[in-house]
Amino acid sequence: MSILTLSLSLMACGDSSWWSKDEPTLKSDQIKRTLPPRVNQREAWGKDIFDITQQLGIPQTKENICSIVAVVDQESNFVADPQVPGLGEKAVKEVQDRLDEKFKDKLGDAIGGTVAGYFQDVLKNQPNPKDNYLGQMRRVKTERELDELYREIFDYMSKHYHVSALTGAAKLVGQDIGEKLNPITTLGSMQVHIGYAKEHKRQGGNIAELRTDLYSQYGGLYYGIHRLMMYPADYDKAIYRFADYNSGMYSSRNAAFQSMLNDLTVAELELDGDLLLYNKDGSIRSVSSQSERELISVFARNNILVTPRQIRTDLKKEKEKKFEDTATYRAVTKLYEEKTGKKPIYAIMPEVVISGPKLSRDYNTNWFATRVNGRYQSCMQRAKRIKI
């Protein structure tokens, strides 16, 4: 298979115009044969993957199916609601060590500290002192259990504790306070961020129902497959899509853009795949990033007529395919080719650290993508034995 065909088979968009039309596809009973031998309920997983890819218009090529299989296997080993070793104790430690800090970060110093105090009181004394929420938290085994416990705690608070302060906090954040403060933000068998699922809801219902859907086998797969596959990128290797799954859409392409920019300046940009600075809620900050400042400097030194305002406008498209059509992207690739005599770089591995209470230690995107890629290669070996 050519590199071009492979890259096309790994891309998606709404009208399917990015897909290779010629490759043979797998049926439901063939998809189950691509799963690792240890997977339970193989037929059900295979059918769900087939049905979801069919619904989303994703051809069931070996490459596409194995990309999906590899990520599911990495994130959950094909368990819809997997147990997380030591999760309860980690959650308790996080609450005890960083509760006040996190609430103030989410709600501000004035209200955050007050609500944190209420929360601590509820943890220690409710629903009763002998079997309090803190003890229940220690006993949780799965992410879903912890998520549901947090929701129960916030529901209790809203009904019994200082309603006026909680209402004020809710007005401040503009949403359900329990959802705002819930630390479980990635869910299900493919660990999809709740914010992404909200933007791409497959059915009606409130946020609690969406969370429940993500913990189901079908729902977890649906949102994960959507996040992994439903955007076009000209990657010549699947590993870059796996990196994007961990560090953000187009982060591999954007890290390559930063790498080219590094070769045009004396600065040493971090190759994290973020060309702008972002707030924790995902909104763009007004302050200029180092990448943005270096672009302005490089363009000025080389008499490239792209204004700072245009640069900012272009960089706002960094999470989209059309960033590649901007004056900024084209100017950098052209200048890079002129200055170095090399072809422009389309993708490299982003340098991003992964951390969180569910992890035993910090990792980076390269670790994640490499692990997924190993599972992808194993899946492709199994797929080669399937005649289609």
Language-model-detected regions and their locations in the chain:
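Bacterial N-terminal signal peptides that target proteins for export
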Residues: 1-2
